[in-house]
Amino acid sequence: MYLAVTCSPTKGVDETMELSEKLIGRGFKVTPHIASKCVSGEKHLDRIIKKLDELGIESIFVPGGDRPEPMGDFNNALDLLRALKKLGHNLNKIGMAAHPEGHPDVSNEVLMEALEEKKDLADFIVTQMCFDAKILNDWMVEIHKKGIELPVWVGLPGVIERGRLLKTSLRIGVGDSLRFLRKKSQVATELMKSSIYNPDDLLKDITEQNDINQTNLAGYHIYCFNQIETTEKWRSDTISALI
């Protein structure tokens, strides 16, 4: 199991690397996020690569990042992935982001083109949260048909306060599936009687999709939103129930 160490648009990659080093010191495997907009250029990236080597980190995730404007030469994840290949590295696993339900600022056509351009520069995909299992299923089938054969880790929200989840989901552009979520009477009832969201029903819906097991589904990436204890308990309990 890897712990994802995200990259704050205000604190930057250096803070991500510092926290990664502390977690490694406590025995964890980490996947730091190297957000392209938070890297100033090739010299900065080269320093990051050297630090990754020093810490023995073998896995990173390359998103665009949440900065309004890039701090340097890399406008998007593709730019940084190309620079990584040019500079060379000892990484075994490089991840890229995907948005099954789209992105508020980018068309679906552009998103798919970007995936196709990045597929040879990355080793795995992590999706943004999606609350509509059918949309997720259809997207997984589509990328499989387009020859994108990378393993896909589907993003699931962890156990989190409902209000915080709704706020975050609307910010990152999963509003359509939230509207779908509200229409489902079983889930809506659950939300009404509890202020805490639990991903059990969503996980069940995903596993019941007809086609998803014929795609490159590798597993699940849990977005815990710093609700580590409750989410880890849910994860452990869910795995125990399957054994």
Residues covered by each model-derived region:
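Active-site beta->alpha loop and helix N-cap motifs at the rims of alpha/beta catalytic domains
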Residues: 1-110
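Short catalytic-loop micro-motif centered on adjacent basic/acidic residues
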Residues: 4-6, 32-34, 124-129, 219-222
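Active-site pocket-lining/capping segments in soluble small-molecule metabolic enzymes
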Residues: 73-100, 147-211, 226, 239-243
